[in-house]
Amino acid sequence: MQIYSQLAPLALGGAHGSAVAMGFFDGIHIGHRAVINGAVEWARAHGAAPVVFTFRLPTENKMKGKRLLSTEDKHALIASLGVEHYLCPDFEEIKAMTPEQFVLGIIRDCNARALFCGENFTFGARAAGTPELLRQLCAPLGVEVVVLPMAQFEEKPVSSTRIRTALEGGDIPAANAMLGMPYAIRFTVHHGAGLGRTLGVPTINQLYPQGFQLPRYGIYITRTRIGDRWYPSATGLGTRPTVNSDESKVTCETFIPGFTGDLYGTDPVVEFHAYLSPSKKFDTLDELRACIDHAAQRAQEYFAE
């Protein structure tokens, strides 16, 4: 997948042009996938190039909520859907455009023959553009517009905000259903205090980068990918109240039964599948170890079913 960070005429798809999926696509949930898949399928049917057009917000911008995916994982996921070209200019580059300027710019820069968006898509300065205006602007130019209905979960529209709320509440099945895949993290393993190894339950320690959405603190059934293999695992997310007096430091510790290798400096994928229990302060380290062992057993049983 080719990635472009600035607007410029690209002549994508040559004489056959391109089909462009438009949106912010922050979580690549089932609604986002419907829009992207629509553009990819249209492009394949017409010999055109499948394209995603999105935009990049400043790191400190809170307009769209905390992040669900890293930039690298987002790119990999979009590429896996069959997208060949990914345009992602800075928001500052497009925020002052009128709806007309925005649409004409997309058509010109992407050599677009078809535009795909969700029914809640807005564009142009002050979000003045709507799907209906998009149709009106594109019709005289012979550009097809396809507006996808919002995906539904439990009879309500799917959104990244709902996914964040589900994660905050520890409702992993709901988050995963709306994402269309298990919620997962892929952060670098760093050295911890070594307590897990002392207890006989060595863990991998990962830190959530600033700006990422945190699930509810607690113990989770997870599975961890190391190389090409998946392992049942148990993950504790929180401030380690039994051994840590600094409640501002959040850690993500995963115990992988049966794995003994060195993962420091690597970035294994940890998928979240079920919330088991809230974080708590144990009176003894033996109680802490028993909790970890129990969670690991639950994880192994979960994936054996």
Each model region followed by its residue ranges:
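N-terminal Rossmann-like or analogous alpha/beta NTP/dinucleotide-binding catalytic cores
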Residues: 59-141
